[in-house]
Amino acid sequence: VLSPADKANIKATWDKIGGHAGEYGGEALERTFASFPTTKTYFPHFDLSHGSAQVKGHGKKVADALTNAVAHLDDLPGALSALSDLHAYKLRVDPVNFKLLSHCLLVTLACHHPAEFTPAVHASLDKFLSSVSTVLTSKYR
């Protein structure tokens, strides 16, 4: 459960990310593919090379979904319901991959915003991404 302090940290961090969310999403996705090659199996039709427009485009979709989630911190299941359906019923993404991408997103944010990435912010963002992952995998059961 996200505390009021977590919600404040998440919103403040996302505000600082601003227009870079799509860029960071693409970078995190590329980092995920490089660090965890098995994640590539869900994207056989993508050009997965460094700087790929397809990876950047999908990274922007990830970032847009997270931006929507940040705007609905009190109703993540409602905000992410359609995305949960897509990943559970159509794409059938292994739930572990959400944790891997979450980790890579945290690393990406820490690289770009080291001063703001305090232990408290890190913990809040980790809880947020874990909550998002839980919602996205809730319909697998």
Curated annotation (Swiss-Prot):
GO terms, molecular function: haptoglobin binding; heme binding; iron ion binding; organic acid binding; oxygen binding; oxygen carrier activity; peroxidase activity
Keywords: Acetylation, Heme, Iron, Metal-binding, Oxygen transport, Phosphoprotein, Transport
UniProt modified residues of type N6-succinyllysine: K7, K11, K16, K40
Reported tissue expression: Red blood cells.
Any Gene Ontology biological process: hydrogen peroxide catabolic process
Pfam families: Globin
Phosphothreonine: residues bearing it: T108, T134, T137
Modification sites for N6-acetyllysine: K16
Xref: InterPro entries: Globin (IPR000971), Globin-like_sf (IPR009050), Globin/Proto (IPR012292), Hemoglobin_a-typ (IPR002338), Hemoglobin_oxygen_transport (IPR050056), Hemoglobin_pi (IPR002339)
Residues bearing the modification Phosphotyrosine: Y24
Phosphoserine carried by residues: S3, S35, S49, S102, S124, S131, S138
Annotated positions binding heme b: H87
Keyword Zinc appears in the UniProt entry: no
GO cellular component: a single term: hemoglobin complex
Top-level taxonomic group: Eukaryota
Amino acids binding O2: H58
Residue ranges constituting the Globin domain according to the UniProt record: 1-141
KW Electron transport (keyword) present: no
Family recorded in the similarity comment: Belongs to the globin family.
Record-linked PANTHER family: HEMOGLOBIN FAMILY MEMBER, HEMOGLOBIN SUBUNIT ALPHA
Function: Involved in oxygen transport from the lung to the various peripheral tissues.
Summary of subunit composition and partner proteins: Heterotetramer of two alpha chains and two beta chains.
Identification of the protein by name: Hemoglobin subunit alpha
Protein source organism: Meles meles (Eurasian badger)
Gene name as annotated: HBA
